[in-house]
């Protein structure tokens, strides 16, 4: 990498067998969710509410949100704490990975054959040693407004 390239850091996470990257600047913490309170009439991807160190978080089931399913049992879920629009969220993931420093020059547009749900939540992709890392656009992932439902 040259000094002219922009480098971004990503926290990697696996959801339904797919590798995702979340901008590290948006990640507050990683934790094991406990005592989730269900919310009646909430959208199916909203798993419930959670109190984490005095903060109330809306917990999002990322498998459902992204339309990613997995046939294997992954055991106890983890959550990544993020903020969006002044609200705190916990994003349920299957596993947490490494922090990667990647050049913005190497980021590619979404492939044309990327599943629609992933494409709508993606800011692009990185190819890593035969794997595809989808870069999540957290603003799109956490947009539950009418415009998002119409898309």
Question: Residue ranges of each PLM-predicted region?
Answer:
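An acidic, low-aromatic, low-complexity terminal/linker signal
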Residues: 1-151
């Amino acid at each position: 990498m040259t000094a002219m390239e922009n480098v971004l850091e990503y926290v990697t996470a696996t959801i339904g067998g797919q590798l995702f990257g979340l901008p590290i600047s948006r990640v507050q913490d990683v934790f094991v969710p406990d005592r989730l309170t269900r919310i009646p009439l909430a959208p199916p991807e909203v798993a419930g509410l959670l109190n984490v160190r005095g903060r109330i978080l809306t917990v999002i089931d990322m498998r459902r949100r992204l339309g990613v399913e997995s046939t294997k049992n992954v055991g106890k879920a983890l959550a990544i704490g993020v903020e969006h629009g002044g609200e705190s969220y916990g994003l349920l993931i299957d596993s947490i990975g490494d922090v990667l420093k990647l050049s913005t020059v190497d980021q590619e547009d979404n492939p044309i054959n990327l599943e629609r749900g992933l494409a709508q939540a993606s800011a692009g992709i990185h190819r890593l040693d035969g794997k595809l890392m989808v870069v999540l656009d957290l603003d799109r992932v956490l947009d539950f407004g009418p415009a998002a439902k119409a898309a």
